[in-house]
Every structure is written in structure tokens, then in C-alpha cells.
């Protein structure tokens, strides 16, 4: 989780957590449109063995939205909890998203984005400054919120690339 991504150019480091929800929802709509635009023959195909297929990026984003909301809940409910780092490659491989129904995944992704947005809108005053340690790195709720937005923005480019969109 970084405030600025040199790979995709994302920099919303000055965006308050309360403003992330609506922006995240707009970006998630772009993700859904991009997934639906990928030709079916490319949707489940990995362009390279270590590069996810577009449907795997969607599955990862579905997981990621729930994980970000859970992180925020932990940071607000506990006094600086410690959370182990997760390996997204392992979770994507275990989930076998290439065999999943794309419309089911899109629906789940949409619901998780909406839940995260609602959760961000309902944060009590001062909650954006609450923090936790992810792996060995302390992060705030504000950074976690922006990271969810970044995940969607960044992987939107990944989804568009294989389909030539």
C-alpha cells in the first residue's frame, strides 16, 4: 500500500478517506465496463504464465475490496492491531477465478465496493487517523481507503491491456 504508484501514475495522497467512496464506485464501474469489453477468448487467458487473466484481476479486486473493508474495521475497533501480510498470487490461484462465472464475480465485486463505500461514509470523526500494522508496516485508515481505490485504478489498466481496450 502506497500513496503514490509510479507504475500507473495514481496519486491521491491528499484525498481524505471520506471522499474515496464515490471515487471508488466510479472507478469500479469502469472496471466492470472494461471486463465486459474483453473478448471472451481473452477473458480467461493469461497473457503470460505469471500475469493474471482479466477475470483473475476481477476476482482479486473482489477479494481486495472485502479485505480493505476488514482492515478498516480492525483499525477502528482495535488499538493498532497487527495483521499478517497476504499473498495475492496464492489467493488468486486457490480461488480458480478462470473457472468462475464473470457476471457472478461482477455482482460480488459491485456489492463489496458498495459496502466499502458505505463503510467509509459512516466512519466516525477521527477514524481516518486510526492505524494498524500490515506485515511490518504501519498504515492508517486513510491510506487503506486510498489503497482500495488504487487497486481498482491500477488493475483497470491490467484488465484493459490483454483485450487491447
Locate the predicted segments by residue:
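Short, contiguous alpha-helical
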Residues: 1-2, 44-88, 129-165
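Terminal targeting/low-complexity segments that flank the catalytic cores of oxidoreductases
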Residues: 1-26
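A glycine-rich, hydrophobic loop/mini-helix early in the fold
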Residues: 26-52
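Acidic/histidine-rich alpha-helical segments that form the ligand environment
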Residues: 23-27, 32, 90-129, 148
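Surface-exposed helix-capping loop/turn segments at secondary-structure junctions
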Residues: 37-42, 121-129, 164-165
Amino acid at each position: 500500500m502506497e500513496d503514490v504508484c509510479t507504475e500507473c501514475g495514481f496519486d491521491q495522497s491528499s484525498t481524505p478517506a471520506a471522499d474515496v467512496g464515490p471515487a471508488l464506485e466510479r472507478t469500479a464501474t469502469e472496471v466492470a465496463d472494461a471486463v465486459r469489453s474483453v473478448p471472451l477468448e481473452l477473458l480467461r487467458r493469461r497473457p503470460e504464465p505469471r500475469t493474471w487473466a482479466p477475470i483473475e484481476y476481477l476476482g482479486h479486486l473482489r477479494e481486495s475490496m472485502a479485505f480493505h473493508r476488514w482492515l478498516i474495521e480492525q483499525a477502528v475497533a482495535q488499538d493498532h492491531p497487527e495483521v499478517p501480510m497476504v499473498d495475492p498470487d496464492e489467493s488468486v490461484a486457490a480461488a480458480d477465478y478462470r473457472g468462475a462465472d464473470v457476471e457472478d464475480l461482477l455482482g460480488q465485486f459491485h456489492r463489496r465496493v458498495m459496502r466499502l463505500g458505505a463503510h467509509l461514509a459512516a466512519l466516525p470523526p477521527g477514524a481516518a487517523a486510526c492505524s494498524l500494522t500490515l506485515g511490518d508496516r504501519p498504515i492508517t485508515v486513510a491510506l487503506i481507503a486510498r489503497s482500495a481505490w488504487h487497486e481498482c485504478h491500477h488493475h483497470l489498466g491490467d484488465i484493459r491491456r490483454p483485450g487491447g481496450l
